[in-house]
A protein has these predicted regions:
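Gly/Ser-rich catalytic serine loop of serine hydrolases
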Residues: 100-104
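Bacterial Sec-dependent N-terminal signal peptides
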Residues: 1-20
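Mixed-charge, low-complexity segments
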Residues: 21-24, 46-47, 161, 189-335
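Helix N-cap and loop-to-helix transition residues
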Residues: 39, 53, 88, 177, ...
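Active-site rim recognition segments
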Residues: 75-78, 142-218
Length: 335
């Protein structure tokens, strides 16, 4: 908490020296009708109608987010990650408040609607060799020239003063080259460094990027494409494997890894419960089919059926029971 206050206060003294790069979009974005402020889709449609160039569209979206969302200091440590992304964005639009994840998801939602490949990056930050006390979230966009750039709408939205958020726009973290972003932002997953030779945590903490080029080149674009095709559970497992591969030394990285393991445990449990429910439904189906045979037998096998049809009335439920038994055995203990 003290770190964030210090960081944002530090930024406050540099704001006056920053040119207003938003001058070519702010007047237009301030004129957006109230009817188009209620969803990311409507905001994106407005931007698309007013701007055609890539840089202008992204800048307009960024400006809208940082100028319309204020840092919610009262809920800094109480982010509800259970709600869906759509619900989180809707609440951010309605309340005009949020912490880093709200800024990031709101910005991502708009630029995604505009057709850009935007990813949310989670990690931790530092300023003047002081590491933040809590993790952080920002964005990265793959531009049409296939180059990745980083964006941090939270840090560009204002600063804290005397326990209150002061709205003061900046552009220091707008469209930053990945290697520059790494001076202050360290992703938990090295994939999001967008470097051929990813740096280590130790390099980040010391501020000295060695980038061992004797290593094999890391094809991050291919890895990202494969990663995005995975299910959420598989993505978490993918992240876990990369964190194990590189090691995780910092306090926040260790905390993220512990949360990651718990998330995977929950996914595993939920998957087992779903499988158990499916097995139960299939077993009941077998019971119903077998009861049909019992009723038919009690009716003295009337009306008449061919032998192969009668055998099928027995073999089908028995096959279901056998399959259920095998699935239960593979499932093991649940709960």
């Amino acid at each position: 908490m003290k770190y964030i206050i210090y960081l944002l206060l530090f930024q406050a003294f540099t704001f006056a020296q920053v040119n207003n790069i938003y001058s070519d979009v702010e007047k237009t974005m301030q004129s957006i009708p109230e009817s188009q402020k209620k969803s990311s889709k409507e905001i994106a449609l407005f931007i698309k109608d007013k701007f055609s160039l890539e840089d202008m569209q992204i800048k307009a979206a960024y400006y809208y987010v940082i100028s319309n969302v204020s840092y919610d200091i009262t809920h800094e440590f109480t982010v509800n990650l259970v709600i869906s992304d759509d619900e989180m964005v809707s609440k951010t639009i309605a309340s005009k408040k949020g912490v880093c994840i709200h800024y990031a998801k709101f910005f991502k939602d708009i630029v995604t609607q505009l057709g850009y490949n935007c990813q949310i990056v989670s990690g931790y930050t530092k300023k003047d060799n002081v590491v933040a006390e809590q993790s952080h979230a920002w964005c990265a966009i793959k531009m049409k020239d296939n180059k990745w750039f980083a964006f941090d709408p939270t840090w560009d939205s204002g600063f804290l003063q005397n326990g209150k958020f002061v709205k003061k726009l900046n552009s220091k973290y707008f469209k930053i080259k990945p290697i520059e972003m790494l001076k202050s932002h360290m992703p938990f997953d090295y994939m999001w460094q967008f470097l051929d030779y990813p740096i280590t945590e130790q390099e980040f903490l010391k501020g000295k990027f060695i980038q061992d080029k004797n290593q094999e080149i890391f094809d991050y674009d291919t890895v990202i494409k494969k990663h995005n095709l995975l299910s959420e559970n598989e993505q978490l497992s993918d992240l876990k494997n990369r964190m194990i591969q590189t090691g995780y030394k910092s306090k926040l990285a260790k905390e993220r890894f512990d949360i990651l393991k718990k998330q995977l445990d929950v996914y595993s449990l939920n998957s087992s419960i779903k499988e158990l429910n499916d097995i139960n439904a299939k077993y009941n189906e077998g019971i119903n089919l077998f009861n049909e045979f019992i009723y038919y037998r009690n009716a003295q096998f009337r009306p008449e059926k061919e032998d192969k049809e009668i055998l099928k009335m027995i073999s089908t439920p028995l096959a279901i029971f056998e399959d259920c038994n095998d699935r239960i055995y593979k499932l093991g203990f649940v709960g």
